[in-house]
Amino acid sequence: MEENKQRVKSMINILQLVAPGTPLREGIDNVLRAQTGGLIVLGYNEQIKSIVDGGFHINCAFSPASLYELAKMDGALILNETGSKILIANAQLVPEASIDSIETGMRHRTAERVAKQTGSLVVAISQRRNVITLYQGNLRYTLKDIGVILTKANQAIQTLEKYKAVWNDGITNLGILEFEEVVTMSEVVHVLHSVEMVLRIKNEILSYIHELGTEGRLIRLQLTELLADLEAEAALLIKDYHQEKTQDHHQILKKLQDLANTQLLEDSDLVKLLGYPGQTSLEESVTPRGYRITSKISRVPPLIIENLINRFKTLQGVCRATIHELDDVEGIGEVRAKKIREGLKRIQEHLYMSRHN
């Protein structure tokens, strides 16, 4: 899993460097439109130096126009790691011929071998096929047309909206069952599955956003709006149902996100994520601590909620508490005690109304 996370992180860094709106991408697009082809290496370490033959050391500031003009020459362009300087133009690259390559064209084969030998980012711009291919180490990625990415991103947003609706239905149903004291592990796992799918699609959309650069701002806004409060509520759901109250619920949500990136989760995986044995029956009754529901009461800060749960242990304990018992909790006076009682009643009524709408 760590290796996969590292690959994803590397890919994000690469895509941000060549995303639309960046000077480097503008220069690459100019070369692509001119159909001259090109080979660009980012980074000039000892390994790169050992395979560079000839070329002109120009060491000038990067500009899209300079890249376009210099790419007309047959050799490769060597830039610094950040792409802010053009160091060498018309360089001949001589990587180890024994390094495996799946490419057929000379330019792309050289790019792949250089990337594998040095670990540097290499950009190959096809002369005839209008394709930009990125190589770094064993990573290979072909940049897609912006229109294609936007279409895929919009489709992913629509899918996310559907799973958000599934989450809303599931969390509403769970809230009703919590007040009725009839929650089983099955309902909790069902809601966590919807969280898993939302996180999976979120990651896919983020990859599109990274590749879209400045063109992805609207998609990012839609994603932010759709996921508003969902992840925070999912973390409180975990805090409610994890077997160990002391566990860091945000860390467990992050673990769920990491798992969602790599595999489809079984019910037993989610049960184990909550600290229970994998073979735990889904029909087993479970009791919420009450963090998620009480956090919906207006003007009750997290510290007061923590005091409430420490005193009454469960959501039902809080619901059954009298005004006098609530008043005894540190930080809660008579006025706030009444607001808590009224707030819980309003939340319950809202849940029932939501189910029937």
Curated annotation (Swiss-Prot):
Domain of life (superkingdom): Bacteria
EC code(s) of this entry: 2.7.7.85
GO molecular function: adenylate cyclase activity; ATP binding; diadenylate cyclase activity; DNA binding
Record field: catalytic activity: 2 ATP = 3',3'-c-di-AMP + 2 diphosphate
Residue span, DAC domain: 8-146
One GO BP: DNA repair
Pfam families associated with the record: DAC, DisA-linker
Protein keywords: ATP-binding, DNA damage, DNA repair, DNA-binding, Magnesium, Nucleotide-binding, Nucleotidyltransferase, Transferase
Chain residues that bind ATP: 75, 93, 106-110
Keyword ATP-binding set for record: yes
Known cofactor(s): Mg(2+)
PANTHER family: DIADENYLATE CYCLASE, DNA INTEGRITY SCANNING PROTEIN DISA
Role played: Participates in a DNA-damage check-point that is active prior to asymmetric division when DNA is damaged. DisA forms globular foci that rapidly scan along the chromosomes during sporulation, searching for lesions. When a lesion is present, DisA pauses at the lesion site. This triggers a cellular response that culminates in a temporary block in sporulation initiation.
Quaternary state and interactors: Homooctamer.
Similarity comment: Belongs to the DisA family.
The protein's name in its UniProt record: DNA integrity scanning protein DisA
Organism: Bacillus cereus (strain G9842)
Gene: disA
